[in-house]
Design a protein with these regions (language model features):
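Short intrinsically disordered terminal tails
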Residues: 1-6, 70-74
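A short, Lys/Arg-rich alpha-helix, primarily the initiator
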Residues: 2-27, 64
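Recognition helix of helix-turn-helix/homeodomain-like DNA-binding domains
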Residues: 39-54
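Short alpha-helical "recognition helix" segments of helix-turn-helix
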Residues: 33-35
Length: 74
């Protein structure tokens, strides 16, 4: 059962490098652009990118869904 929990953690979490990649894929060039798009402060995005604070699960899931939808469209 612990493997299931680990898999869920892996799917939900997002490293700073993954966040940078998601920003690039979705066309967000700045922290402010991403922050405005998802309704958070620029400083929150900055903390995530610096690895000082983890990317919240809902944000990671949202970004992954947006990437998935974008790939289906294009």
């Amino acid at each position: 059962m612990s493997d299931g929990g680990s898999n869920k953690e892996m799917l939900a979490s997002m490293s700073p490098d993954e966040l940078r990649g998601a920003m690039r894929t979705l066309g967000y060039r700045t922290q402010s652009e991403l922050a405005n798009a998802i309704g958070v402060s620029r400083s929150a995005v900055s903390l995530w990118l610096e690895g000082k604070v983890g990317v919240p699960r809902p944000v990671a899931m949202l970004l992954r869904m947006l990437i998935s939808a974008q790939r289906r469209i294009y």
